[in-house]
A protein has these predicted regions:
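Beta-strand/loop-rich accessory regions of lumenal/periplasmic or secreted enzymes
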Residues: 1-140
Length: 140
């Protein structure tokens, strides 16, 4: 995975103040945080473009639509369902695909003063407004 956005670590609406805008690269498997209980991880905020390729450079390019501004991007080796249903890392299945998510925004993850802390109001998505989003993707 290569991306032009915030990095190099995962970033969320409430977890990005220490991140720097730049071009970063890692392996899809490296986007899985080593939490004791698998959970949401690996998001990249304020992404202008991202590439997911194999060793030969074949893959997909995802680009923000200039009218929408930067996007949230993630590439993980598991689906959200697989992550949410595993109580321990060893319960995750063998890796056999890459799951890409592209979105206009993603709410914060909370947990800033303890593991049970809810997301602060300013980092929640507005549910009373219509949200539209477009992006471009093409094969490489």
């Amino acid at each position: 995975v290569e991306w032009y956005g915030l990095g190099p670590a995962e970033t969320y609406a409430d977890r990005k103040k220490g991140a720097k805008l730049g071009i970063y690269e890692n392996m899809v498997k490296d986007n899985m945080a080593r939490y004791m209980v698998p959970q949401e991880c690996g998001a990249k905020e304020e992404v202008r473009w991202a590439k997911v390729t194999d060793r030969k450079g074949r893959g997909m390019l995802f680009e923000m639509d200039e009218n929408n501004g930067p996007m949230m991007f993630s590439a993980l080796p598991y689906t959200p369902h697989e992550i949410e249903n595993a109580m321990h890392p060893y319960e995750l299945p063998e890796v056999h695909y890459t799951v890409v998510r592209v979105a206009k925004d993603q709410m914060g993850v909370g947990g800033d003063d303890s593991w049970g802390a809810r997301t602060h109001k300013e980092y929640l998505l507005k549910t009373d407004k219509k949200m539209e989003f477009s992006f471009v993707f093409k094969g490489l």
